[in-house]
Amino acid sequence: MTEPALSSANNALMQKLTGRQLFDKIGRPTRIVAPMVDQSELAWRILSRRYGATLAYTPMLHAKLFATSKKYREDNWSSLDGSSVDRPLVVQFCANDPEYLLAAAKLVEDKCDAVDLNLGCPQGIAKKGHYGSFLMEEWDLIHNLINTLHKNLKVPVTAKIRIFDDCEKSLNYAKMVLDAGAQFLTVHGRVREQKGQKTGLANWETIKYLRDNLPKETVFFANGNILYPEDISRCMEHIGADAVMSAEGNLYNPGVFNVGQTKNKEKIFPRVDKIIREYFQIVKECQESKASKTAMKSHFFKILRPFLPHHTDIRSTLATMNAKATWEEWEEQVVKPVEKVVQEIFEQPDIAIKDEITIGEKQSWGGSYRTVPYWRCQPYFRPVNGITGDKRVMQGLIDESVNKKRKADVPLESADKKKDVKA
């Protein structure tokens, strides 16, 4: 691959918006759909914006494949991605080669507001491919990746990182990323080892430490521990972040971003039948987006997670659906049956009582749990060491207390049952 032209690099730097300029230009978004592998695709971004999201990231895209494989691009990008209904938009890539990263980013720079480098993915595929959080020890390479985009793209470059156990090392890491040219910094408050059943609690205190000790002009996003809409404002206030990013919280309940609708359960805990129908219609309208239809089955399972154990016939049918199924088959075998069941539930004489959402006592982490009927979207409490539900928070606290003390002696803030999905 050839070196980028110097004149092109100079022009890009002259015209490029800095962090605060870009943040203002895209409307100062505060509620962000996280980059999620095979999950934050076009149709899901459109749905999330309808329910309060003000900025969205694409799924993590593999830079080398995107730059070199036409099929990969067609499977993951369409003419609708980055269109007027899909802005503001940040396109995220994983990479370990500056030239391939730049080549990939050049293909989308006219269809997005910024390009993000994934430095947070903790999954085995990232370890095997040598990208994401498995670059955390290679600061020279990370600096080169970011700086190459900073000097040669029309649009700004941003980055999403995880933290180290050591607060000072995390701070120096963040400073390096910013020095390389990142205009937005997203900090996921978990270390690389926190994934799956070891996800545990995101450390808001470490995120706050970074925010407090980085330049004030840094555009700073926090990621981790978002279960309900009020957690967003609580996170922003505690940390001083410009915005909050949600991954799994958004996947199981798009209403998590509806911060101005906290007394409207139809907005913050929407009925699964209505969300399924609305999302299905969006996917049909985005037929140019192969990624949207490919992701639909996975989204259905997440939206319907509390519902399916009560209606195993629908779960069995959904499990058999595949990419060859027609739109009519999806509607007749999945969408309509869900609608029928929920409609029957709402015809019950005591539905007003059954449909109540109760709020528990305030917890040590600052928020309260909700008891939500299974026919409404709601957070997913991922099991930890076989423990499910709210009890896993206490297990997380116990596990933390018996593990080695964090070098910076920073206490954990807030409790969470979600993990960052692949990004």
Swiss-Prot record:
Gene Ontology biological-process entries: mRNA processing; tRNA modification
Organism phylogeny: Eukaryota, Fungi, Dikarya, Ascomycota, Saccharomycotina
CDD domains tied to this protein: DUS_like_FMN
Descriptive protein name: tRNA-dihydrouridine(16/17) synthase [NAD(P)(+)]
Cofactor list: FMN
Keyword Isomerase applies: no
Quaternary data: Monomer.
Gene for this chain: DUS1
Compositional bias of kind Basic and acidic residues: 408-423
Organism of derivation: Saccharomyces cerevisiae (strain ATCC 204508 / S288c) (Baker's yeast)
One of the record's GO molecular function terms: mRNA dihydrouridine synthase activity
Family statement drawn from the similarity comment of this UniProt entry: Belongs to the Dus family. Dus1 subfamily.
Binding site for FMN: 35-37, 92, 160, 188, 223-225, 247-248
